[in-house]
A protein has these predicted regions:
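ABC ATP-binding cassette signature C-motif
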Residues: 1-247, 293, 297-630
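Intracellular alpha-helical coupling/juxtamembrane segments of multi-pass membrane proteins
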Residues: 234-277, 281-288
Length: 630
């Protein structure tokens, strides 16, 4: 059953039509993911559904009594207010009705108020707020001004949830959230009993949350059942069909144009209906809105750096009593694509500054490579002068930029990033969040750099631009450091991941091969290895030194092992010890930066053997545990 529907909606700003006969419905209990290009009108559509804006034409129908709550992309709160007071605004009607009842104002119908109080559960609004704060791990007594962007997002969600809405509208809910918070939000939304409509460019989030995707494209809404992965398959088929249909229509139009030019005689001998048909074809082609242009990304890689970008040995960093990095070891080589993941405030930026020489460690050593030319992408956009034009931002004092050794006019370069010449002369302050990120990317890629540092580059970028950025970074010859909470982006770009694991020990960071999913798999495997290794030690110590193992084994086992199994059990501790020793030796070899230069073939074999040892060690420990349980 549809709880709301929008039909034949039209909305335009100037000559740009954002909605052009758009229509969709939202079913009870479904989670709708709204996607589309930056500037396509997604936020405007969400505000229309929320009742904050009105379309130029069209009809929005809601079921009677439908409660809708809208959480904007950047919630604005009174910085001096407490979290409890802000969240309580979500039950403003319940508070007002109960206050009116308690004040017994003259002429007030107390029976009607009592009925309304019970309908709103107004007697218990404080408990509802407290319960919601507890569920979202928020401290009601804290001032909002003290909170991070991610915690402010939680406050906005709490304010919406405490109202018990039938429909929850979310605009970019994952912005400013770390990976743990995103996983928490996914679980919360999957358990939400009402309907959800959200805008996000986080493809993994859409895969895990959405039950249907709707795409706003050239003013029209198209619906795709399933999550984002299902949408990708359907979209590919749809675009192929559209291309074939357009080609057929253009061919037919060309044939009719040839006929109409044959002259008066042809028009006398042919049906007037054919002329009318041609006019219809011309009108259809003029009305057909072509797909928007694609961002074209190029990057100036500058002169190559040395083979080693940075070598860190037992590096630690603390600020007072707070330990951000403890005993970290890593070797970063030219061409590595390194992802840094961890919760907000864990020290990702601090670790990056240590690697790049902007901070000196309180302990340990950092050896940095030669000829490093570093370019930064700033997630807070602090490098942008809001009063400067786009052209001056990209190329101050010049009409030309140099990219990849070739000169290019700044207007042409900005056009590659979908900025028209008129837009190129506009001040930065007139741009949306996504457009400002595109300007930052344009500026970043115009710099001659062999090391790129990207801090949350995916915020506000549409999916098409994200995919093109992924392709560019994959083919980039220099070194990339990427701080991101976009799991799909990490998986598609990075070759290794430096992950915060401070929940085990303060300031602990570990390096893993591969992206986010590989990190999750390897971390789970390593955790299992550590747990099993911890169990084997007390077992060995418990055995009397002089007691022969075969004689002791049958007493401890419910079923006697076979001779072959007993021999295997006796040999397994030796094999495990040997594998651990080999693993340690290979780790020491891999940590030697000079070895990569002296014998790259040997290092490739060592890397391969390192992965094999993990598998063999895990298998040996599991077998030892299985035999020991018999």
């Amino acid at each position: 059953m549809a709880v709301l529907s929008l039909s034949n909606a039209h909305l335009a700003f100037g000559h740009v039509a954002l909605l052009d006969g758009a229509a969709f419905s939202l079913e009870s209990g479904e989670r709708l993911g709204l996607i589309g290009r930056n500037g396509a009108g997604k936020s405007s559509l969400l505000k229309i559904v929320a009742g904050l804006e009105k379309p130029d034409d069209g009809l929005l129908q809601l079921t009677q009594g439908l409660r809708i709550c809208y959480v904007p992309q950047e919630p604005l709160f009174d910085a001096a207010a407490s979290v409890f007071d802000i969240v309580s605004e979500g039950v403003a009607e319940a508070k007002s009705v109960r206050s009116a009842y308690e004040e017994h104002a003259p002429g007030v119908d107390l029976d009607a108020l009592q009925t309304r109080i019970e309908a709103l559960d107004a007697w218990n609004w404080e408990q509802r707020v407290d319960t919601t704060l507890h569920q979202l791990h928020l401290d009601g007594e804290r001032r909002v001004g003290e909170l991070s962007g991610g915690m402010k997002k939680r406050v906005a969600l709490a304010q919406a949830l405490v109202a018990v809405p039938d429909v929850l509208l979310l605009d970019e809910p994952t912005n400013h959230l770390d990976l743990d918070s995103i996983a928490w939000l996914e679980e919360l939304l999957r358990g939400f009993k009402g309907s959800v409509m959200l805008i996000t460019h986080d493809r993994a989030f859409l895969d895990n949350v959405a039950t249907r995707i709707i795409e706003l494209d050239r003013g029209i809404i198209r619906s795709y059942p399933g999550n984002f992965s299902a949408y990708e398959k359907s979209k590919e088929d749809q675009l192929a069909a559209e291309a074939q249909a357009s080609a057929r229509a253009d061919k037919l139009l060309a044939q009719e144009e040839v006929w109409i030019r044959k002259g008066v005689e042809a028009r006398r001998t042919r049906s007037v209906a054919r002329i009318q048909r041609l006019e219809v074809l011309r009108a259809q082609r003029q009305a057909r809105r072509e797909s928007l242009g694609q961002v074209r990304l190029e990057v100036d890689t500058g002169a190559p750096s040395g083979k080693i970008v940075a070598e860190l040995r037992d590096v630690s960093m603390r600020f007072g009593e707070k330990v951000l990095v403890s005993g970290f070891n890593a070797t970063i080589l030219r061409g590595d694509k390194v992802g840094l993941i961890g919760p907000n405030g864990a020290g990702k930026t601090t670790l990056l500054k240590l690697i790049l020489g902007e901070l000196e460690p309180t302990a340990g050593t950092v050896r940095r490579g030669s000829k490093l030319e570093v370019a930064y992408f700033d997630q807070m956009r602090s490098v942008l002068d809001l009063d400067a034009t786009l052209a001056d931002t990209i190329s101050p004092g010049s009409e030309w930029v140099e990219v990849g050794g070739a000169r290019k006019h700044v207007m042409s370069y900005l056009n590659d990033f979908l900025f028209s010449p008129e837009r190129a002369n506009s001040p930065v302050r007139t741009l949306s969040g996504g457009e400002r990120n595109r300007v930052l990317l344009a500026r970043l890629f115009a710099l001659p750099a062999n090391v790129l540092v990207l801090d949350e580059p995916t915020n506000d970028l549409d999916i098409d631009t994200l995919e093109l950025l992924e392709e560019l970074l994959q083919n980039y010859a220099g070194t990339v450091f990427l701080v991101s909470h976009d799991r799909r982006f990490l998986d598609n770009v990075v070759t290794s991941t430096i992950a915060w694991e401070g929940d085990e020990s303060p300031g602990l960071w570990r390096e893993y091969e591969g992206g986010y999913e590989e990190w999750r798999t390897q971390r789970a495997r390593a955790q299992k290895l550590r747990e099993q290794a911890a169990r084997i030690v007390p077992s060995d110590k418990a055995k009397p030194a002089a007691a022969p193992a075969p004689a002791a084994a049958p007493v401890a086992k419910p079923r006697k092992l076979s001779y072959k199994e007993q021999r295997e059990l006796d040999e397994l501790p030796k094999r495990i010890t040997a594998l651990e020793a080999e693993q340690k030796a290979i780790n020491e070899l891999l940590a030697d930066p000079d070895a990569y230069v002296k014998d790259p073939q040997r290092m490739a074999q060592a890397n391969k053997r390192h992965a094999q040892i993990d598998e063999e060690l895990l298998a040996a420990l599991e077998r030892w545990e299985a035999l020991g349980a018999k």
